[in-house]
Every structure is written in structure tokens, then in C-alpha cells.
Swiss-Prot record:
E.C. no: 2.7.1.23
Organism: Chlorobaculum tepidum (strain ATCC 49652 / DSM 12025 / NBRC 103806 / TLS)
HAMAP family: NAD_kinase (MF_00361)
Protein name: NAD kinase
List of residues binding NAD(+): D66, G67, N134, D135, R145, R163, D165, T176, A177, Y178, S179, M180, S181
A GO molecular function held by the record: ATP binding
Functional description taken from the UniProt entry: Involved in the regulation of the intracellular balance of NAD and NADP, and is a key enzyme in the biosynthesis of NADP. Catalyzes specifically the phosphorylation on 2'-hydroxyl of the adenosine moiety of NAD to yield NADP.
Cofactor(s) this protein cannot do without: a divalent metal cation
Gene (UniProt): nadK
Keywords: ATP-binding, Cytoplasm, Kinase, NAD, NADP, Nucleotide-binding, Transferase
GO cellular component, one term: cytoplasm
Family label: Belongs to the NAD kinase family.
């Protein structure tokens, strides 16, 4: 078995865990490699280009927060991904640092279960396709002279056209990310839906809408000038021209996250979003 390891190199705790993990793997003669950035930060010569990892590795380990897991999952190509939470929030990273060894034991022995998560696929007019686990984000861009109008079609039927700072299309997994911050609903992970969430719309009647994930969404920006950022999981991938149409639908590829059977979704929401009746006192 061979592992691909991604590390949040800005966190000393993640780097420390990476060193402990490699010692654990070496002691068991289990092969591993890092992505180039992680290897450089650790001074390790065992690395491969990110695009090659899925061909040579059997499983992926993300040491960091949800951002590190998103990066690892982008290159996993449906290989199992185990997330060790060294971040602040950790909706996706299933295991704490103390649980890492149990998770690794289960992964090596094959005694683990999987949470399968849907992805989004955005196709440009050029034919290029991009994928994301959390969301596809259309933004107005800094050069726009006036608030642009975003036109949305569902299965080629007009849903609406309205002025806003942007539009988020999120999976159920991504509903607790940017979409939630923009006023979108929280959606249970196994729900077969997407949510379309406007960012600061210039109209009180414009609200997020939940749609079936078998729908095809087409979005264009109605503006006379400017370039408009297209982001996948928060990372800018393209600048769109005015009127350029992007087609978004469910990707045929999915992400397999190694499940922590001790985690309960309601408990996660209570803890991460402070929904408990017990609130910090500041003492």
C-alpha cells in the first residue's frame, strides 16, 4: 500500500503530525510520498507531482483543515481520503489528531467505511471542464464599473436574472462553506441536491434556491465590460468574458472520504456552530 500525504505547511502541529506519521509508516515498511509543497516544508525527498499521485497511490491523507482536504481530494480520483483536523472548523476532516493512529490502522487493514460525496462540474464554452467538491463561484470582479446581472437557466428554462456581487452553486457538502456565510441553508451531506445562493443581491426578493442535483445549470454575466472570476472551491480558475456561458452540473466523479463512525452529524453542527444551550462565558 502507498499513501499520498498533503500537509498544511502553515501549521506547526500539522508538520509535527506529518513527521510522526512518516515514522509510523517507516516502522511498518509502508510506502508514502508527499505533494511537492509539503515535501519541501518537511525537507523530505519523497514526493511526486500532484497530478501523478492518483496513479501511484492507494489512499490519501490530509493533515490540516478542510482546505487541505479539499486540495487532496481534488487529486484523489475517487481514492479514499482520510482527513486529520488540525484546522479551526473541520466540517470535512473526520478525525482529530488523537484519532489519527486508529484511522491509519483501519485504512491499512482495509477495515473502514466511506462517505461518498458528490462533486460539481463546470464546463466552459471552450469545452474545458473543472471540478469542485464544495462550490462553483461566479463573482463580479474588481474591474466591473457597475453591478453586473447574473442570468441563470435550469435545464434551459430561465430561472432569473438579477444584479448581485456573485452567485454560489454549492453541493450539500459545500452548503456549510461560503454558501452558508452568504445566507444559504445547511443541507444534510447525503441529500441529492444543490443550492444556488446569491451573494449580496440588489433585490430583497432574491433568495437561495435548492434544486435537484440532476438539473443542468447555465450561468452568464450580463455586462458590457470587465472580466469575472470563476472560482472552484474558493480558488480562482478562470476569468470569464461578458456573456460567456458556463454550464454546471453534477460531476460523474465523486470523492470518497474515510468515515469516522464516532462522529454524529447533529453533534458536529452543535459543536462547530455553537448551537448548544451552553455558551462561552468569556472567563
Amino acid at each position: 500500500m502507498k499513501f499520498a500525504i498533503f500537509v498544511n505547511t502553515t501549521r506547526e502541529k500539522a508538520l509535527e503530525l506529518a513527521r510522526e506519521l512518516t515514522a509510523w509508516l517507516d516502522a511498518r515498511s509502508i510506502d508514502y510520498v508527499f505533494d511537492p509543497q509539503s515535501a519541501k516544508a518537511l525537507g523530505c525527498g519523497k514526493w511526486e507531482e500532484k497530478a501523478d499521485l492518483s496513479q501511484h497511490c492507494d489512499a490519501f491523507v490530509a493533515l490540516g483543515g478542510d482546505g487541505t482536504l479539499l486540495l487532496a481530494s481534488h487529486y484523489s480520483r475517487s481514492k479514499p481520503v482520510v482527513g486529520i483536523n488540525v484546522g479551526d472548523l473541520g466540517f470535512l476532516t473526520e478525525f482529530s489528531p488523537d484519532e489519527m493512529w486508529v484511522a491509519m490502522d483501519h485504512l491499512v487493514s482495509g477495515n473502514y467505511s466511506i462517505h461518498t460525496r458528490s462533486q460539481l462540474e463546470a464546463t466552459l464554452e471552450s469545452g474545458e471542464s473543472l471540478t469542485s467538491l464544495n462550490d462553483v463561484i461566479f463573482e463580479k470582479g474588481s474591474a466591473a464599473r457597475r453591478l453586473p446581472a447574473f442570468t441563470i437557466l435550469l435545464d434551459d428554462e430561465m430561472l432569473g436574472s438579477y444584479r448581485a456581487d456573485g452567485i454560489i452553486i454549492a453541493t450539500s457538502t459545500g452548503s456549510t462553506a461560503y454558501s452558508m456565510s452568504a445566507g444559504g441553508p445547511i443541507i444534510a451531506p447525503k441529500s441529492n441536491v444543490f443550492v444556488i445562493t446569491p451573494i449580496c443581491p440588489h433585490m430583497l426578493t432574491v433568495r437561495p434556491i435548492v434544486i435537484s442535483d440532476d438539473k443542468t445549470i447555465k450561468i452568464s454575466v450580463d455586462s458590457q465590460s470587465g472580466e469575472f472570476p470563476l472560482k472552484m472551491d474558493g480558488i480562482q480558475k478562470k476569468l470569464l468574458a461578458p456573456g460567456e456561458v458556463v454550464t454546471v452540473k453534477k460531476s460523474p466523479h465523486h470523492i470518497n472520504l474515510v468515515a469516522n463512525e464516532k462522529r454524529n452529524y447533529c453533534e458536529i453542527l452543535r459543536k462547530k456552530l455553537l448551537w448548544s444551550h451552553e455558551h462561552p462565558t468569556g472567563e
